[in-house]
From Swiss-Prot:
Extracellular side: 36-574
Segments on the Cytoplasmic side according to the record's topology features: 596-629
Protein location: Membrane
Chief localization: membrane
The name this protein goes by in its record: Sushi domain-containing protein 5
Domain Sushi: 138-199
GO molecular function annotations of the record: hyaluronic acid binding
Transmembrane parts of this sequence: 575-595
Ranges annotated as biased composition (Basic and acidic residues): 225-249
Organismal lineage: Eukaryota, Metazoa, Chordata, Craniata, Vertebrata
Membrane topology summary: Single-pass type I membrane protein
Species annotation: Homo sapiens (Human)
Domain Link: from-to ranges: 39-134
Length: 629
């Protein structure tokens, strides 16, 4: 009697556990998360708390057309690719590979894998991620095409293979090169230095990093024209043409090669924003690092379309030679670009054309002399006619709260002596400026500065305020005035020096606040170059004749100085001055409040429209007037 084999139902029952395990594995695969980086990718559990066993990792990679990476493949990926996944996963031989990450140097500190650790004895039954590499016939895709370039040969389309390109007949490469190669790296990308083929010696270097898709070509005609124009401009600039070729180098990272060059590269960004402009970049992973782009003052450069209004209060002076904020100015033609960059970019100025895009700041150079970042001209201390006309439109004579105080170098400080109850300062043609006399103790009533001959003085009208610039000596008339009598204690030993910073443009505005009479006396000197300011009052001035040629000038006697016990007491002077100043400030604040309230009352009503829908808006409009209380 022969023994019968197991019946078909029995065989199905024996296979059920294996089928259930396979079904559970297939159901679990979609819940895996994938972190891909080109040809290399990582499979791990969805929640990150549980990994995969070795067999499950193999099946997971195989289901996605890949296989577990070997130790050599993992090292090659970390070395050549910009791999930013830090994890521990299964390798093909059952060992564990761990990618060690570190933050890169520079402004953008990005985590990047820099090393690999191999663990040959993993914990039995442990679960880890799966380190997979794709199994494709063309990991880098079809060979790219370039203008006037012929693909002469190739070793293959797998990882590590190279493509050899030569120029078409009648075209040559720059730097006397005859061919260039592209490498299919472990990241699944064609990588290398692309030489542009042209009809002359003009050259262009391109770091090929996905700049050219596989299905299209990019024209280099505009790039060649821009390069020729920039080369001509560089020859006229001197040493600018010698610095550019030194920077046309590239970081070459080749699988299986030991020589690795690390340097800067010029990347013409054809097909990207700002076509035709030279962009400094680090390769691989070139990034635009140009920052801190500023304009020079608009008064020095008058170029259509590039002028920019700059407020005098917000102008900054930049000093050349600073490592962090150096301004590289290329002197020469007005058509020269000057790009202000930091130390991250290549050294030397970048010279380009005027038709650049992407918002490159462009200024034209000037032959004028420069002092502290501003052009020095003959009229540096005077207003332009346009500014005087704008100031003339304000001719109501009032002094605004936001007006600047008149500060001129080496000019005497003028003290306004007014009635104690006055709240605002309203200049007029008859305004008198009393100057503090640097002599002994004087009982000053009022001293008025008036020109000798009105016809011999020139005045510049600024509203109701008149600024006199005289070339003749002034005479001083002592007159009685109903103003409050002020006492000053002035000694030659307590004079202080007032340092006045040089300003570019001095607005012809009078001070908006009255200077306190208790201010310490100051001593200034009049420049000998330009006699455009009133003379200082001193004892030597009253003891001699004026230097001017006027014959009708008279020298009136000055006030007698008091000596001994006859001098009036000065104990109440500072107190009275303080009270007067406080009252003036309070009245000024009250006036500001009244003006603000008046303006607010002018806009007391607003009209609003009611949106009632698209259909009803044709036949019905409703207005609501709301009055502010």
């Amino acid at each position: 009697m022969t023994a019968e084999g197991p019946s078909p139902p029995a065989r199905w029952h024996r296979r059920l556990p294996g089928l259930w395990a396979a079904a559970l594995l297939l159901l679990g695969l979609p819940r895996l998360s994938v972190r891909a980086d080109g040809k290399f990718f990582v499979l791990e559990s969805q929640n990150g708390s549980q990994g995969l066993q070795l067999e499950a990792a193999r099946l997971s990679c195989k289901s996605r057309g890949a296989h577990l990476a070997s130790a050599d493949e993992l090292r090659r990926v970390v070395q050549d690719c910009s791999f930013a996944v830090c994890t521990t996963g299964w390798l093909a031989d059952g060992t564990l590979g761990t990618t060690v990450c570190s933050k890169g140097s520079g402004e953008q500190q990005i985590m990047r894998a820099v090393d690999v650790r191999i663990e040959s004895n993993p914990v039995p039954g442990g679960t880890y991620s799966a380190l997979c590499i794709k199994d494709e016939e063309k990991p880098c895709g079809d060979p790219p095409s370039f203008p006037h370039t012929i693909l002469q040969g190739r070793t293959g389309l797998e990882m590590g293979d190279e493509l050899l390109y030569v120029c078409a007949p009648g075209h040559i490469m720059g730097h006397r090169e005859t061919a260039f190669t592209l490498l299919c790296n472990s990241c699944g990308e064609w990588y290398g230095l692309v030489q542009a083929c042209g009809k002359d010696e003009a050259e262009a270097h391109i770091d090929y990093e996905d700049n050219f898709p596989d299905d299209r070509s990019v024209s280099f005609r505009e790039l060649m024209e821009d390069s020729r124009t920039e080369a001509d401009e560089d020859r006229g600039q001197g040493d600018s043409s010698e610095e550019a070729p030194k920077q046309d180098r590239l970081v070459s990272i080749s699988v299986g090669r030991e020589n690795i060059a690390r340097d800067k590269v010029f990347v013409p960004t054809t097909g990207l924003p700002g076509a035709g402009s030279s962009v400094p970049a680090d390769s691989p992973g070139s990034r635009l690092l140009q920052k801190h782009l500023f304009w020079f003052p608009a008064e020095a450069f008058h170029k259509p379309g590039l002028e920019k209004e700059v407020d005098d209060d917000t102008k900054k002076q930049f000093s050349a030679g600073d490592n962090h904020s150096g301004v590289k100015l290329v002197p020469g033609e007005p058509e020269t670009k000057v790009i202000y960059g930091n130390t991250d970019g290549p050294s030397g100025p970048f010279v380009g054309k005027n038709d650049s895009k992407a918002g490159d700041p462009v200024v034209s150079s000037s032959d004028e002399s420069w002092l502290d970042g501003y052009p020095v001209t003959e009229g540096a201390w005077r207003k332009t006619e346009a500014e005087e006309e704008e100031d003339g439109d304000r001719g109501d004579g009032s002094v605004g709260l936001d007006e600047n105080v008149l500060v001129t170098p080496d000019q005497p400080i003028l003290v306004e002596v007014k009635k104690p109850k006055s709240s605002t300062l309203t200049p007029s043609e008859g305004m008198t400026h009393s100057s503090v006399l640097p002599s002994q103790m004087l009982d000053v009533e009022a001293l008025a500065l008036r020109p000798v001959n009105a016809s011999e003085t020139e005045g510049i009208g600024d509203g109701d305020l008149t600024k006199y610039q005289s070339t003749l000596p002034w005479r001083f008339i002592t007159e009685e005035s109903p103003m409050a009598t002020l006492s000053y204690e002035l000694t030659s030993s307590t004079l202080e020096i007032l340092t006045v910073n040089t300003v570019k443009q001095t607005p012809n505005h009078i001070p908006s606040t009255i200077m306190a009479t208790t201010q310490p006396p100051v001593e200034t000197t009049v420049p000998e170059i330009q006699d455009s300011f009133p003379y200082l009052l001193s004892e030597d001035f009253f003891g001699q004749e004026g230097p001017g040629p006027g014959a009708s000038e008279e020298l009136h006697p000055t006030l007698e100085s008091c000596v001994g016990d006859g001098c009036p007491g000065l104990s109440r002077g500072p107190v009275i001055a303080t009270i007067v100043t406080v009252l003036c400030l309070l009245l000024l604040l009250a006036g500001v409040g009244m003006v603000w309230g008046y303006r607010k009352c002018q806009h007391k009503s607003s009209v609003y429209k009611l949106n009632v829908g698209q259909r009803q808006a044709r036949h019905y409009h409703q207005q609501i007037e709301m009055e502010k209380v």
